[in-house]
């Protein structure tokens, strides 16, 4: 079976206009992940695994590595009930993994009910 290529400088929708393919390539998330308080993955793109590092801590393994560790990483979570999250942090980044943690108002690590991450940058 032969492998083919699709080459285009722009994408055009019949009613929504056009967009340059550079915007699609450079402006799209290369990784996204949503997981629950039990660290069960609810949905993902380009994630091979999620390691539970203990309460409020997680390490995400990337399926197709990033080109370098200079990518942009967004992380947010929501805690159940009246627990307020006062700190969410990105602990470390590497081409094949990144780690996060979250704390409540008292500074104790806490598992968010819904945890979301997205990564923007270049794939290797």
How should these model regions be labeled?
Residues 1, 15, 70, 94-97:
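Generic low-complexity, intrinsically disordered sequence content enriched
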Residues 2-65, 105-124:
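Extracellular receptor-binding modules and their adjoining Ser/Thr/Gly/Asp/Asn-rich linkers
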Residues 77-124:
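Extracellular jelly-roll beta-sandwich "head" domains, especially the C-terminal globular C1q domain
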């Amino acid at each position: 079976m032969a492998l083919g290529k699709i080459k285009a400088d722009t994408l055009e929708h019949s009613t929504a206009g056009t967009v340059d393919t550079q915007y699609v390539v450079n402006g799209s998330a290369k990784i996204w992940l949503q997981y629950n308080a039990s660290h069960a993955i609810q949905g993902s793109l380009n994630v091979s695994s999620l390691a539970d590092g203990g309460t409020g801590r997680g390490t995400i393994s990337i399926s197709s590595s990033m080109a370098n560790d200079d990518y942009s990483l967004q992380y947010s979570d929501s805690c159940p009930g009246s627990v307020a999250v006062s700190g969410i942090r990105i602990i470390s980044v590497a081409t094949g993994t990144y780690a996060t943690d979250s704390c409540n108002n008292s500074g104790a690590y806490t598992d968010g009910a819904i945890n979301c991450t997205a990564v923007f940058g270049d794939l290797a």
